[in-house]
């Protein structure tokens, strides 16, 4: 009985630690993808390519929202807001403003990997 209880506790603790690792790596992977696509959005925005800026900003937003659901912090939330603003302004043809918002999103998303508030 005592051995069985110890095995159950050990298995539970192991499962807890493994799930925490998956949780953390899922958040990080989505933030990394969000940053990658936001960087592409900025690069295209600087070239005046509105359609490509929008494509990458939308993909970045998808990953930023997934990162938020996986335990993102306030920086992820700010990044999401800037991506939404980038998309809004891009759709209105304001490529310069959209590019600035995409750049702000990158800064917040990168900061989210270093701080937990």
Swiss-Prot record:
GO molecular function, one term: metal ion binding
Gene Ontology CC entries for this record: periplasmic space
Superkingdom field: Bacteria
Claim: Zinc is one of the keywords in the record: no
Spans annotated as 10 X 7 AA approximate repeats: 27-111
Localisation: Periplasm
Keywords: Copper, Metal-binding, Periplasm, Repeat, Signal
Segment forming the signal sequence: 1-24
Sequence repeats: 27-33, 34-40, 41-47, 53-59, 60-66, 72-78, 79-85, 86-92, 98-104, 105-111
Chief site of localization: periplasm
Ranges in coiled-coil conformation: none
Induction record: By copper.
Complex and partners: Monomer.
Role played: Is capable of binding multiple equivalents of a variety of divalent and trivalent metals, including Cu(2+) and Fe(3+) but also Mn(2+), Ni(2+), Mg(2+) and Zn(2+). Is able to bind up to six Cu(2+) atoms. It is proposed to be a metal scavenging protein that has a role in cellular copper management in N.europaea.
Record's miscellaneous remark: There are two separate and distinct copper binding sites, a high-affinity site and a lower affinity site, which display negative cooperativity.
Record-given protein name: Metal-binding protein SmbP
